[in-house]
Amino acid sequence: MSLMKVSLLLGMASIGLTIAVVFLCYSLYTYTCETNDASSYNKTTSSTTFSPLMSSTLPASEAPWEKDFRLSPDIIPKLYEVKLHPDLITGLFTCEEKISVRVLSRVNYIYLHIDRLNVTKSVVTQNGVNIPVKSAFSYPKNQYWVITLEKSLEVGECTLEFLADGNLRKQDIVGFYESRYKAANNETRLIATSKFEPTYARQAFPCFDEPSMKAKFLVKLVKPKDKYIALSNMNVKNSIEDSPGPNQTTVEFEVSVPMSTYLVCFIVCDFNALPSVKSTQGFPVNVYAREGQLENMKYAQDIAVKSINFYVEYFGINYPLPKLDLIAIPDFVSGAMEHWGLVTFREASVLYKKGSSSVVNMKRVAMTTSHELAHMWFGDLVTMGWWNDLWLNEGFASYMQYKSLAKVEPSWEVDTMFLTDMLHSTLQLDQTLSSHPIVQTVSNPDQITEIFDVISYQKGSSVIRMLENMMGADNFSKGVNSYLQEFQFKNAETNHLWAHLQRFAGNMSVTQVMDTYTRQMGFPLITVKKNGDQITFTQQRYLANSKANYDPNDSPFKYTWHVYITMTTSDAPNQTLSTWLYRNASEASISVPAKTTWVKVNRHQVGYFRVNYEPDMWKALIDQLITDHTVLDPRDRSNLLDDAFNLAESEHIGYNTTFSLMKYLSKEDHFVPWTDVYNKLARLEDKLYGTDGHANFQKYVRSLLRDKITTDTWVVENKDFLEVNVKIVLNDLGCNFGVKTCLSKAEELLRKWFKTGEKPDADLRGVVYRYGMENVGKEEWDQMWTKFKEEANPQEQLKMLGGLGSVKDIEQLEKFLEMAKDEKNIRSQDYFTVIIIVANNPIGLPVAWKYLQNNWDNLVKRFGLNHRVFGRIIPSVCSKFKTEDKLKEVEDFFAKHPNAGAGAAGRKQALETIQNNIKWVNKHAKPLAEWLEQNVSEEDV
């Protein structure tokens, strides 16, 4: 599944508030789930008479379904035969199901998963004989359907049959749910679709809903006879018209390969498809979308074909299904989902129209598509055995999307983008005490939902990138191929991957090295010193708060790491020197020529660590950048900026070093270093906002841009990907920090659109809407709202939301949040985007916080505490607080609402961030204000 960062907040997960906020949905949008109300789901009947609340023959204290969240290993599913009939008029669905299972030991009970289903029939058959059911009932605490039997099952084959019904979900858009859209004639059209990862298949049909319980699926879907189609993971086998009734058609699909329940997909819709395109392997790649959007699927189809061809060649294993479908869903809780053979997307993640979509949108479509197709192997073909190894799915897919696009879109320099897309944001989280290891124990749905986060996706991909660099690309590829070959159609654990990579890793112990990065949180700070011809390296744990207390014994490795150190030097800037700093060693060293003037450690930032240098070594690097920055690769320039800002924040170096480093930026033309600078300057401004140094800080940033922003910056007719991206970043940065020519241009283009209907260039719209709307009145706000309601392009709508939430009118922002409650105004999938947009507006931050406090109970009722984005809304809103009063408010709020659900980790992160902000303001705000007063020129831009 594509998390595309809640840094991911945005498709351009990196570029400031404007572009960043617009794509919030790309990150950490996922699913919603609420715990069952037992009273609602105990209405059951069976072919055998029993009391629905009858207890098991076992004492309650010994009942396995009561004491264990995990399923029993005694019953293994082999084949599901599932027939679902969604009624798009009533919003209900029925389920007829038969499960063939293997019984591995004699038991007189069976339990499997259900949630929000009403089971009306439970039949157990073995060797052609019905086994009398003693009782059948729901156990909501663990989301089980329990069947106790009059006699024990024998070892061997067994069949379970169920009838059930449920509601097509409308608000949480997980499980089997209803999605709506407006047709060209303004008619509301309905479709039924599904999203089962991680624990929502049980909301559609009784099942053994754990990833290790792989089985084959024979799916039948009932659809309206005319106009509608039915889609599932496999291709259609046959269709029976007027079945089960008039004007209905039952569509039967071929039996699937073995797969986990969360990968199954059911869709009944009235969409159309573009002509199929064949892969080099020969299977068709199809794309589907609603009326008016189908042509905008062409780019995704093209990327899909090229990506799938790359993966077949790279992995050395053919795609195992007879077809591959991609479909754009109007209401979708995450960026996309890798259902095997039927990949579902949020529309904003997959639609691209040349000439009216931006390069940011294009990148998002390409990244999301490549990510999901990597899952066809990592996740679908080979699946983690349990959710504690989720990173095997998501970390690998997140890295492979970059390898694929390096081949598909070579001019994009995707490995350079990896730094600001993935690496820097995960370092930001992982340098806190509230982080967690990549591999961690999870047991219940809230914990499972919670680990679909930056650590699983972005840290996972970052350490894989590091490991490939350690091993070499060819050896890494061979190890991956070996792993996939052995575990295809099976489940695997982290140690299995290490074992296969070890075969091609030479003398390096993959397990010993990588366990220090996957089984403990955090990362090292490498301190570099020069003594004659020796460059020495030492390590310590890096924390954003360098004075924080922690117990090294909390980690099995005592927060030390095996570090593969690479570096380049002034004498040979295109060559790489390397050594190992082992976790129990006091130091390591590399010899260099005595004439060496500078060294840059962690070449291309492939290592997962930060680097600090002695003052003279920092000065030598800064001098080189000012003299000729191109001697260092853009990845190294971005790395230096990222480390320098963070090291100053954690008090390892002074801000004078960081500000000196930025002097070279007048010569910088690559968008990745500028993207990193924007992110860091915006974070620094958040801390300075409301302090004496804020105005001078804005003036300082404007001085950095004096030679960078010209009239040409607003001309994006040349669609060179890298050039357009740097213009987007510079325009956004200039507007954000008050460059007058930027703000006036944004307002000019906005008013021109309002007056003449001529839209700004697609690549400028995010900036124009965001900053052009800052100072408008109610009339212009209403005008933008009308345009938002009339707009059919979901990507364009997201940009408009960014403008609607940017006004400096508190009353209007309050009204906006109230309007967003109504799903007729804002789709449920975009609701939290609106809140975060308002919170990212300095005027709107207290408005959004007050809104959350006043509406919390209603939000819990609407979304449930298992909703991942809801779980992260608190740190998203509160991360800019920096006073003791606000800290107390947040603590009191948590005390008033102690049940965090999937937001428990987010709450810890919020508190730690606020505490660190308070510490920073107390330590740095005054001296930084004094430095700015002395060093900022009177001349302004």
Show which residues each predicted segment covers.
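Hydrophobic alpha-helical and helix-loop surface patches within well-folded domains
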Residues: 253, 284-548, 683, 690-710, ...
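A surface-exposed beta-strand-loop module
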Residues: 117-182, 245, 587-593
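Hydrophobic helix-coil surface modules that form long, contiguous segments used
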Residues: 95, 194-199, 206-370, 399, ...
